[in-house]
Amino acid sequence: MRSEGDTWDITTSVGSTALFVATARALEAQKPDPLAVDPYAEIFCRAVGGSAADVLDGKDPDHQLKTDDFGVHFVNFQGARTKYFDEYFRRAADAGVRQVVILAAGLDSRAYRLDWPAATTIFELDQPQVLDFKREVLAGVDAHPRAERREIAVDLREDWPQALRDSGFDPDKPSAWIAEGLLIYLPASAQEQLFTGIDALAGHGSHVAVEEGAPMTPEDFEAAVAAERAANEQGEQRMFFQLVYNEQCAPAAEWFGSRGWTAVPTPLADYLRQVGRPVPGPDTEAGPMIARNTLVSAVRA
């Protein structure tokens, strides 16, 4: 379970979820018709080794990401989510935005794999050990960012707005923000703090995009945590419900919309249909997760 002020690297606690998601992105890239291709996802997996690499080589057919009930749909989910945020950044760049803020950057490689306009600066915020891992792995394969990239080692439960300004962020210029796979790992109070920080720093012409999940009922959440613990006792390595906060400060579209942003929420299930991927039924392991998830983008005039 989480504790106040807890920290992590790429193989522990919340950091391990970034590796799990990177593995899903790497599996998506292996498809003949991928929704998005992140060539660095596989590099991160192989740098860690173990099951993250084995599943890519077909050596772990029982891996959670290979199951029909969950894995197939989760890989589709990550392909769709990656595509959504990639296209969001392209729209922001086309609109003239040259400051990009990636909150809880994890193993996000967009600074290296997307085509950025000249004079773009990308600010990546995350735990120091996570940023160290990414930098060392990418340097090891001689990868170079396609825009100016600035690392900001900070906990998003601390004064990250000041750390961002100290790194050269200009709140008077438009910016593009993402919170991808982040909000569920923050309690409602920290989500509110995060949204407030974005709203305070985002000038006119700014964009924001977030992924959010509607909370489960307390009974369903407690049952999911108990089932996960039981699976761990049987030797399975599952750690998700024990890491998340089953809380939400407010739906993002409502929160930003009430503060002058034009927000567009897209239920994940609708987006999966839009990009030609199946939507899992409610009786599958992945179904309820997909049904609760929404992708939101907003623009400040």
UniProtKB/Swiss-Prot annotation:
Chain sites annotated for binding S-adenosyl-L-methionine: D126, D155, L156
Domain of life: Bacteria
Pfam families the record matches: LCM
Enzyme class: transferase
A GO term for molecular function: methyltransferase activity
Keywords assigned: Methyltransferase, S-adenosyl-L-methionine, Transferase
EC numbers, comma separated: 2.1.1.-
Gene Ontology BP term (one): methylation
Residue runs in coiled coils: none
Family named by the database record: Belongs to the UPF0677 family.
Function of the protein: Exhibits S-adenosyl-L-methionine-dependent methyltransferase activity.
Protein's name according to its UniProt entry: Putative S-adenosyl-L-methionine-dependent methyltransferase MAV_4873
Phylogenetic lineage: Bacteria, Bacillati, Actinomycetota, Actinomycetes, Mycobacteriales
